[in-house]
Curated annotation (Swiss-Prot):
Propeptide positions: 57-87
GO biological process, one term: glucose homeostasis
Keywords on record: Carbohydrate metabolism, Cleavage on pair of basic residues, Disulfide bond, Glucose metabolism, Hormone, Secreted, Signal
Taxonomic placement: Eukaryota, Metazoa, Chordata, Craniata, Vertebrata
Covalent S-S links between cysteines: 31-96, 43-109, 95-100
Protein name: Insulin
């Protein structure tokens, strides 16, 4: 009984000290390696997708045509691309420039 009485304050302290899982990750700014580590943590074995703008332009011929100003209906495509670019936010805009949550990070998992 005396052992239990000695351990009770310690157990109470441990229970109170343990962070609540919902509060363990508050919305925060994540940039660079911290962003990558958070993605690994959230996505786990599923992994995540990442396509830098410089590589995306090389791999996607339509984007390359838009940047060079060529191709059929280039003016219409350029206008559409600008509208989409203004609406679409990347992970850096969401999590580094602004703050993001675990749920927003999960959108980038495979």
């Amino acid at each position: 009984m005396t052992l239990w009485m000695r351990l009770l304050p310690l157990l109470t302290l441990l229970v109170l000290w343990e962070p609540n899982p919902a509060q363990a990750f508050v919305n925060q700014h994540l940039c660079g390696s911290h962003l990558v580590e958070a993605l690994y943590l959230v996505c786990g074995e599923r992994g995540f997708f990442y396509t830098p703008k410089s590589r995306r332009g090389v791999e996607d011929p339509q984007v390359a045509q838009l940047e060079l100003g060529g191709g059929p209906g280039a003016d219409d495509l350029q206008t559409l691309a600008l509208e989409v670019a203004q609406q679409k936010r990347g992970i850096v805009d969401q999590c580094c420039t602004s703050i993001c949550s675990l749920y927003q990070l999960e959108n980038y998992c495979n």
